[in-house]
Regions:
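NTP/phosphate- and nucleic-acid-binding module
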Residues: 1-75, 80-95, 100-636
């Protein structure tokens, strides 16, 4: 038989006998590599090592260091989970069990209601299956045969999945010991490869995500190649749980979500203090970058949303109402309102660039199951801005937006990486304009010396964009900021300006948001700082702790002076021991605690403690007062 040739990532070509599998090929390359390889990327597709080589294909072998390798190992872990459940509860019916980001899950239909204690039993059975090191084999069968096969096993969900496939489909299954599952793969060679795993939680999940269908039991888990990696990940999760903004939001009195308004957060006084500081900072930065602030209405007519395209493409996410027998909608986005502000007057080329910024409250109908603290809500404030400009101003304006983003993220010690998302298949607009817009984004980010990666085809249909992914103190990334060149709304709304030639032209429009959502950003910062906010942001900046009742008057006089200069201060005048008061203030994560007793009253001093336990000792009150005012003003 003729040889087949494959191309490796370094560009080199390797030839093998026809019929050679990917798994056999990697052994020829390196035995040590073969022990680590879990799957392969063939012409951009994640592929099972059991598959035969295809002549001329580009092949990259994947280990656990690669996303495809992680996906494959965790997919196999989900099958081991399913096999363990079937051993323990043979009557259980299996639905789906994919790998997901950071782990895997399996949806199961069974009479027994799973408990956290059951997870331990399942893990023990999974460990037995791993120890058995069962070879994993792939088989295929015609569609009708597969339907009959799974019907005989009473696996109704598998039958439904197969019935949705075309009649000529070839159905693939994977087996390990006496367990077989419908699956497209890929999977690792044997169950023994999955050495480090942990089942994490149980949740409810509707079959196929449809609340009209039966509620199944979903078991979540994760898997790693090495136990040390699993332990490190679980430690990270423990730390993240301590920092959960929902938990800290309640403990610190920042916000609450009531059953009367699911997805609609209430900001409490301390939460508003924090929020106001963020908004003040936002306004200062935008003032420095020559933005003008606007505010647009929350409710606007159906006609506007038809023009913008939201009525046809986003209506299911919008809240609507009737006013004077006409349909209106609560805005899900600020952009159309910003366009109306632009259209309030005819503009000349001399007016550009125009920079309009808005902290605009928007509402979107999210499914109740998707709601999550401040991270996923139904009402939130977007820090949107729309920059209207001439074509030759595009790169300069983009660079200014990039500078603005850097200034804001740097204030919070947030590292970030940037992705340039390019033209998708369903793009609207002229190819030349797309190329010019993409090139302008690329040139701007390169001119600022900021590393970025290309995210091909992931731009919006109306324009390319820069997506900012910020990294918090635990190393987790969050997609926040977006800089978008919008070629859709200017066209839909027919916005114009009078050019130097006296003719009407269409301006270029940048749509950008840095925080993304004020609520979500507050949630991220709460977890980033573990609730111990910098002094300028802290809801309570100073807590004065009188040792006894006779020191309360002095404490209140100090608080009065600080309050007059807008320092957020509280006095703990309860009849409690000073050690208890200090612990309570530490738990409230107040940046500064001032202990006052006889000595302090007599000398006009305060004994200063910082959150975290540092004792700064006794200092004159005026000295402390001046230093904290500078710290707050300079946002150190």
């Amino acid at each position: 038989m003729a040889d087949v040739k494959i191309i490796l990532p370094d560009g080199s070509a390797k030839e093998y006998a026809a019929g050679t599998t990917l798994g056999e090929a990697v052994k020829h390359l390196s035995n040590s590599l073969a022990k680590k390889v879990l799957a392969a990327n063939v012409n951009g597709e994640l592929t099972d090592l059991r598959e035969e080589l295809v002549d001329g294909s580009e092949v990259a072998f994947l280990t656990f260091e690669d996303e495809g390798g992680k996906h494959t190992l965790r997919h196999t872990a989900s099958h081991i989970l399913a096999q363990a459940v079937k051993r323990l509860w043979p009557e259980a019916k299996l639905a789906i069990g994919p790998a997901i980001d950071k782990g895997f899950y399996y949806d199961i239909d069974m009479e027994h209601t799973l408990t956290p204690e059951d997870l331990g039993k399942i893990e023990k059975e999974m460990s037995r299956i791993v120890k058995e090191n069962l070879p994993i084999t792939k088989s295929v069968m015609p569609r009708q045969e597969a339907i009959e096969f799974f019907k005989a096993k009473n696996e109704d969900y598998k039958v439904e999945l197969i019935q949705d496939l075309p009649e000529d489909a070839v159905i693939s299954c994977y087996s390990q010991g006496d367990f077989i599952d419908l699956c497209a793969g890929p999977h690792v060679a044997s169950t023994g490869k999955v050495k480090a795993f942990k089942l994490q939680s149980i949740a409810g999940a509707y079959w196929r995500g449809d609340e009209k269908n039966k509620m199944l039991q979903r078991i979540y888990g994760t898997a790693f190649e090495k136990k040390e990696e699993l332990d490190a990940y679980l430690h990270l999760l423990e730390e993240a749980a301590k920092r959960d903004h929902r938990k800290l939001g309640k403990e610190l009195g920042l916000f609450v979500i009531k059953e009367e308004g699911p997805g609609f957060p209430f900001f409490l006084p301390k939460g508003m203090a924090l929020r106001n500081e963020l908004e003040n900072f936002w306004r200062e930065v935008h003032h420095d970058f020559d933005y003008e602030e606007i505010r647009t209405p929350i409710i606007l007519s159906k006609h506007l949303w038809e023009t913008s395209g939201h009525w046809d493409h986003y209506r299911e996410n919008m809240y609507t109402t009737i006013i004077d027998d006409e349909e209106y909608a609560i805005k899900p986005m600020n952009c159309p309102g910003g366009i109306l502000v632009y259209q309030n007057e005819m503009h000349s080329y001399r007016d550009f660039p125009l920079r309009y910024a808005e902290l605009g409250l928007v509402h979107r109908h999210e499914l109740s199951g998707a709601l999550h603290g401040l991270f996923r809500v139904r009402a939130f404030t977007q820090d949107d801005a729309h920059v209207f400009m001439l074509p030759d101003q595009m790169q300069t304006e983009l660079m200014k937006v990039i500078e603005l983003f850097d200034r804001i993220y740097s204030q919070f010690g947030l590292k970030y990486h940037v992705e340039l998302s390019t033209k998708p298949d369903n793009a609207m607009g002229d190819d030349a304009i797309w190329e010019a817009a993409t090139e302008a984004l690329r040139n701007a980010i390169e001119a600022k010396g900021i590393p970025y990666v290309i995210n091909p085809g992931d731009g919006a249909f109306y324009g390319p964009k820069l997506d900012y992914h910020i990294e918090d103190s635990l190393g987790r990334t969050w997609q926040c900021g977006t800089i978008q060149l919008d070629m859709n709304l200017p066209e839909r709304f027919q916005i114009e300006y009078i050019g130097e030639d006296g003719q009407k032209h269409r301006p270029i429009m940048i749509h950008r948001a840095c925080f993304g959502s004020m609520e979500r950003f507050i949630g991220i910062l709460t977890e980033h700082y573990a609730g111990a906010f910098p002094t300028w942001m802290a809801p309570v900046q100073v807590k004065i702790l009188p040792i006894s009742e006779k020191h309360v008057e002095y404490a209140k006089e100090l608080a009065k002076q600080m309050h007059r200069d807008y320092v957020r201060v509280e006095v703990d005048d309860r009849s409690e021991k000073i050690g208890y008061k200090i612990r309570q203030a530490q738990m409230a994560k107040v940046p500064y605690m001032l202990v006052v007793g006889d000595k302090e009253v007599e000398e006009g001093t305060v004994n200063v403690r910082k959150h975290g336990g540092d004792e700064l000792g006794s200092v004159p009150f005026e000295e402390f007062f001046n230093s904290i005012k500078i710290e707050i003003k300079e946002r150190n």
